């Protein structure tokens, strides 16, 4: 257990040395200035528009930064043979995997806290707290997905492409379902039925990220605690699947 915690500690230390948190802070400051511009341009409901813009853009920005950091960190370790060196010691592969995942999860919690503080002056604190906890779950889930993809592909470009394709599809799957069931389409056409089946299958397989970190919690007030329960449940289920897949892929590699 101490070795796992040591790997997690060095993973967090690497994030500090590569100035990831400074990058997140700079992005939040720039987006905050952009939200002020949106507030001045808007004619009505200026605060709601400012909050919505800052929340949506900050969520996408921090997810992009975290996933890119996880990918670049892991690829650098593979290329520098750091993984081989660690696994040559008395350390099981599962210990290395959980150490890295724990470190990236800690970084995700710090980034979620920073992002929530950036919104605390615009929205009620209960809504910000719910939004921040949901963002932390979303970041942890995306970090686990990126870790799995890097172990599988061992290259940044295919891994990041898959991660963001997955994220955009999971985030918009409800809208895709509505479009596939539109009354403007011919319900008897085979193409419409096939598309509907494919979309339903994807909606069953993918996590419903559209219900994560909703901007409405900030501008309309927080929902019931059951909304956070759904987020935690989805994060736990899909996080466990990603951990199992990542461990399987790591153990079958010849390192």
Identify the role of each PLM range.
Residues 41-43, 165-248:
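Terminal transmembrane helical anchor/hairpin motif
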Residues 15-17, 140, 152-153, 172:
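Transmembrane helix irregularities
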Residues 24-29, 158-170:
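Central hydrophobic cores of alpha-helical transmembrane segments
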Residues 32-73, 97-159, 178:
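Secretory targeting signals
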Residues 18, 247-255:
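Membrane-interface capping segments at transmembrane-helix boundaries
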Residues 93-94:
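Alpha-helix N-cap/start motif
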Residues 1-22:
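Aromatic- and glycine-rich beta-strand/loop motifs that create alpha-glucan
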């Amino acid at each position: 257990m101490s070795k796992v915690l040591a790997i997690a500690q060095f993973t967090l230390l690497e994030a500090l040395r590569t100035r990831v948190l400074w990058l997140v802070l700079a992005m939040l400051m720039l987006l905050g200035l952009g939200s002020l511009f949106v507030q001045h341009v808007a004619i009505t409901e200026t605060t709601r528009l400012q909050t919505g813009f800052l929340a949506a853009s900050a969520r996408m920005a921090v997810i992009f930064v975290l996933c890119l950091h996880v990918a670049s960190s892991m690829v650098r370790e593979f290329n520098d043979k750091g993984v081989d060196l660690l696994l040559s010691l008395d350390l099981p592969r599962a210990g290395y995997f959980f150490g890295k995942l724990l470190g990236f999860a800690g970084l995700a919690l710090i980034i979620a806290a920073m992002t929530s503080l950036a919104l605390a002056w615009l929205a009620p604190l209960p809504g910000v707290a719910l939004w921040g906890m949901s963002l932390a779950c979303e970041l942890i889930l995306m970090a686990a997905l990126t870790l799995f993809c890097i172990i599988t592909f061992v290259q940044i470009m295919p891994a990041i492409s898959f991660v963001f394709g997955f994220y955009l599809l999971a985030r918009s799957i409800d809208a895709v379902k509505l479009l596939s069931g539109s009354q403007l389409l011919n319900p008897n056409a085979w193409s419409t039925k096939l598309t509907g089946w494919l979309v339903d299958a994807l909606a069953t397989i993918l996590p419903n990220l559209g219900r994560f970190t909703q901007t409405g919690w900030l501008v309309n007030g927080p929902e019931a605690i059951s909304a956070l329960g759904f987020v935690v449940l989805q994060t736990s289920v899909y996080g466990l699947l990603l951990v199992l897949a990542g461990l399987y892929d790591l153990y079958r590699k010849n390192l």
